[in-house]
UniProtKB/Swiss-Prot annotation:
Official protein name in the record: Octanoyltransferase
Annotated Gene Ontology cellular component terms: cytoplasm
InterPro entries hit by this protein: aa-tRNA-synth_II/BPL/LPL (IPR045864), BPL_LPL_catalytic (IPR004143), Octanoyltransferase (IPR000544), Octanoyltransferase_CS (IPR020605)
HAMAP family to which the protein is assigned, alphabetical: LipB (MF_00013)
Record-stated family: Belongs to the LipB family.
Entry function: Catalyzes the transfer of endogenously produced octanoic acid from octanoyl-acyl-carrier-protein onto the lipoyl domains of lipoate-dependent enzymes. Lipoyl-ACP can also act as a substrate although octanoyl-ACP is likely to be the physiological substrate.
Species name: Haemophilus influenzae (strain ATCC 51907 / DSM 11121 / KW20 / Rd)
One of the protein's GO biological processes: protein modification process
Keyword Transferase: yes
Length: 212
């Protein structure tokens, strides 16, 4: 297995532009293409999963709604949320299937939050990561030709109010939380968090990291 992982820090980006770049990357990659992680924040946007139900958008606003091809229902992205897109050839990894990749992503977040003294956990029937019953991280993947794209979105220090305009991930009344609810503002920083996410993800899947 090629155990090299390229990490790209992309800053603040338009959702649709990055989504199309992910699709292009996945469609054109071959057996020699290295796996990549894209770290990004997005301008405010609601994204609807491939099987998303329109009734989960409760209130229209000036925030655009984009139909996506990832799994899951509607969610919200905005600055102050660390998004980690996972562009991996699953076939390269012995004993790794889609469910195990989801578990690895959830454990990446659990281990990252533990470094801040936060006890978090996944739910078997509702992908993502939770703290005291509130959701702190959403997760949705798409698999094409045995390769993953899309990934996770971890709330760090953002305006959570627009989550009230939706049933987050299709769950009515689901409360959201973020890292800034539990730590000092200076620690609720996407750059600091992203380094921890990459460290734990690489350790879980046995990658060597190259940052671009």
């Amino acid at each position: 297995m090629n155990n090299s992982l390229i990490v790209r820090q992309l800053g603040l980006q338009d959702y649709q532009e990055i989504w199309h770049k992910m699709q292009d990357f996945t469609d054109t990659r071959n057996a020699e293409t290295q796996d990549e992680i894209w770290l990004v924040q997005h301008y405010p946007v609601f994204t609807q999963g491939q099987a998303g139900k329109p009734e989960h958008l409760l209130q229209r606003s000036e925030i655009p709604v984009v139909q996506s091809v990832r799994g899951g229902q509607i969610t919200y992205h905005a600055p102050g949320q660390q998004v980690m897109y996972v562009l991996i050839d699953i076939k390269r990894h012995k004993n790794l299937n889609v469910r195990q990749l989801v578990t690895a992503l959830e454990q990446t977040v659990v281990k990252t939050l533990a470094e801040y003294g936060i006890e978090s956990y996944p739910k078997p029937d509702a992908p993502g990561v939770y703290v005291d019953g509130k959701k702190i991280c959403s997760l949705g993947l798409r698999i094409r030709r045995g390769c993953s794209f899309h990934g996770l979105a971890l709330n760090i220090n953002m305006d959570l109010n627009p989550f009230h305009y939706i049933n987050p991930c299709g769950y009515a009344g689901l409360e959201m939380c973020q890292l800034a609810d539990f730590v000092n503002q200076d620690k609720a920083d996407c750059d600091n968090v992203s380094a921890k996410l990459i460290k734990h993800f690489a350790n879980l899947l046995g990658y060597n990291i190259t940052t671009l």
